[in-house]
Amino acid sequence: WFIIKMKKVVLIKYGELTTKKDNRNFFINSLKKNIFSKLSNFEFDIIDDYYRMFIIPKNDDIEDIVIKLQDIFGIHAISIAYSSEDTDVENIKNMSLDIMNGFSGKTFKVVTNRSNKAYPIKSMEMNNIIGGHILKNTPFKVDVHNPDVYLYIEIRRDAVYIYNK
């Protein structure tokens, strides 16, 4: 048996805000202000980590938070992700398997984004490691062109985030 230390967070991708390099901080701060305003009834922490924001709810209101964020200008995509500060490959394998076991479908694809370039395992290698682990331990098959389930893995400076849309 293994113990997985992961928590649910809201991953926010912001799009066009970062194309205006000179005004980047202004737009990001404006987006943050809008998020705080929309979520004024919730308790949460927010992490701004270059091209992403992560909202860590202090209660179980993650679904309500996602709904509130839907119409904020500047947000490109919102996902519920599972995060862990343990970025060891064994933990990522266990997290990925646990998350995949919650999905229905027959095929999958792993997509890794390694913004932490100091991380020793490259993105394609991580795709293969995690994909192999899922293949061995579930009935899922790989389909890189049209999978039923995408499993996204983001390896950042201080944590790993895993989500499917």
Q: Where are the predicted features?
A:
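RNA-binding accessory domains that recognize and position tRNA/RNA substrates
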Residues: 3-165
